[in-house]
Amino acid sequence: KDKEILKVIACADLDSNKSELFSKNYKIDKFSVEEIFVNDDIDLIVNLTPPSSHFEISMKSLEHGKHVFSEKPISLSMEEGKKLYTAMKKNSVYLFAAPDTYLGPAFKKGTELLNSNQIGQIIGGSASFITHGVEGWHPNPEFYYKKGGGPLFDMGPYYLTALVKLLGPVIQVSSYSEKNFNKRLVDNPEVKYKEIEVEVDTHYVSLL
């Protein structure tokens, strides 16, 4: 809860029951979403909202002079990303986004090996993630199949970040995607609903 350079001040959620429970469990204050933005004791906001809300919450945070660490994706479009960048510069704050796995020891070692030419000339890299879906285990799988969800935004950032970190920026993209199923059947007994209307593509093949 409290570290030498970090103190958790409060939590907020549109669902007051969730924020109340979190507040009691971790013994921190519970604020409304709007209170989080204007509280002078808060320097950094961790944005863990659903993907479709990332841009709105991050933008309001930046406009109120707060640093932001956002869950992936940082936004749902390039235009939204540019607006966040502009707001960050204008308000002299920092904007970070998951995943931060590229800061780990494996990537540091990989970068070291590449830069020292110990493994020769690299001509490419590959990454894959294959699974049936999250509806069999996730406590709230519906968001995954709505706007801002799907494997591209949920798992893609891990692999894309790794490739860019090790091999450099992407210049050109060729990609194919499809939905596969229009509906997903939920077989997790803890989830109340049993069927999900799929709104996003769930299968991607890309060449970068």
Language-model regions, residue ranges each:
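Short acidic-hydrophobic, aromatic-tinged amphipathic segments that line or gate anion-handling sites
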Residues: 29-33
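N-terminal Rossmann-like dinucleotide-binding module
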Residues: 1-26
